[in-house]
Design a protein with these regions (language model features):
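Adenosine-phosphate binding glycine-rich loop
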Residues: 175-243
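ADP-ribose/adenylate-binding Rossmann-like module
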Residues: 107-109, 146-153, 162-187
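Conserved SAM-binding strand-loop segment of SAM-dependent methyltransferases
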Residues: 125-131
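Short, acidic/turn-prone active-site loops that include or flank metal/cofactor-
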Residues: 45, 111-114, 131-135, 153, ...
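Short amphipathic alpha-helix with an adjacent loop that forms part of the alpha/beta core around
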Residues: 133-143
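Short glycine/serine/threonine-rich phosphate/pyrophosphate-binding segments
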Residues: 92-95, 155-160, 180-183, 270
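Short, glycine/polar-rich helix-capping loops at beta-to-alpha or helix-loop-helix junctions
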Residues: 113-119, 156-159
């Protein structure tokens, strides 16, 4: 089974990956991993999932489907969410801190050494202290990359937005007044930029909560990132922490259970696919929402 978890940990976020688990019937417990509709791995030797390669159901969110009287749980790998912040001014600091708090990997681009140092102290995973155009050449982008443009002037905004629009992305947000953002967009349109991508750029950036201080504005920006992430892509619970724990050679002989929500009722905040790894000694990685249910599972 470690082969499956290694596949999940290393899968390309720009490919359509899918994990299937048979919940009942003769194939109960069998798993399979698909990428772009092609079967990459299957746990059983009976080939229960082989026919799915020819007729893979259209699945947009984690949940249960029924195939030939067998219930099958479908989920997607939870790719690492990446924040790329252009600019390390006052607003960027809480964005970095809250971004790390929600589990994102944070990269900051800043051409001023003093401000780059501030980003490092705030906890950014990577800080590129160089011109924005040069720094963005090192950022490949993918469907799990969220670009936040908070530079000190519209000419820098324009440079960043022009380069970012050509990359794969999950989100682009740009701070600035309406007049400033309109000016930047108009200039890029005149240079032949894709109007559809320009229209998708979140300006003004952040949810409209009336934020005034850098901290309040930072909250609104991350809130919008979270909203976009959860609106567009319902992901499963194979977080990097859980995958790291499962694949950790030091604990390979310790028994553990991977608890997964396969369906939910009511207003529980945790979606299908959410996972918690429970060790025999009571340690846990992740959470399925806390409360009495989680306590019972740990017991």
């Amino acid at each position: 089974m470690s082969e499956l978890y290694n596949l999940i940990a290393s899968c390309n976020p720009n490919r359509q990956s899918l994990i299937l688990t048979a919940l009942d019937g003769t194939a109960a417990g069998e798993k399979a991993f698909f990428a772009d509709g092609s079967l990459q791995w299957e746990s059983g030797k009976k080939g229960f999932f082989s026919h799915f390669a020819e007729n893979l159901p259209d699945i947009s969110a984690p949940g249960i489907i029924t195939e030939n009287s067998t219930r099958i749980f479908c989920e997607f790998p939870a790719h690492e969410q990446k924040l790329v912040i252009c600019g390390a001014g006052h607003v960027s600091i809480p964005v970095i801190q809250i971004g790390r708090m929600i589990g994102c990997t944070v990269t900051v681009l800043e051409d001023r050494p003093k401000f780059a140092d501030n980003a490092r102290r705030a906890g950014a995973d990577t800080v590129l202290c160089q011109p924005f155009e040069e720094g963005l050449k090192k950022i490949p982008g993918d469907r799990d990359t969220y670009f936040i443009i908070v530079t000190r002037g519209h000419r820098y905004d324009q440079v960043c937005l022009e380069k970012i629009m050509k990359k794969e992305h999950a989100y682009i947000g740009m701070m600035g007044s309406r007049a400033r953002t309109v000016k930047v967009k108009q200039a890029l349109l005149e240079q032949g930029a894709d109007p559809q991508i320009l229209e998708s750029v979140h300006t003004p950036i952040g949810l409209p909560i009336g934020g005034e201080t850098p901290e309040e504005i930072g909250v609104s920006i991350i809130a919008e990132v979270i909203q976009e992430k959860n609106r567009c892509r319902k992901r499963g619970g194979f977080t990097k922490e859980i995958l790291r724990a499962i694949l950790d050679e030091k604990d390979k002989d310790i028994k553990k259970v991977l608890a997964t929500i396969v369906t939910k009722k009511g207003s529980s905040p945790r979606e299908a696919g959410t996972k918690m790894l429970v060790y025999q000694d009571g340690r846990t990685v992740g959470t399925i929402g806390g409360g009495c249910l989680e306590a019972d599972i740990i017991q």
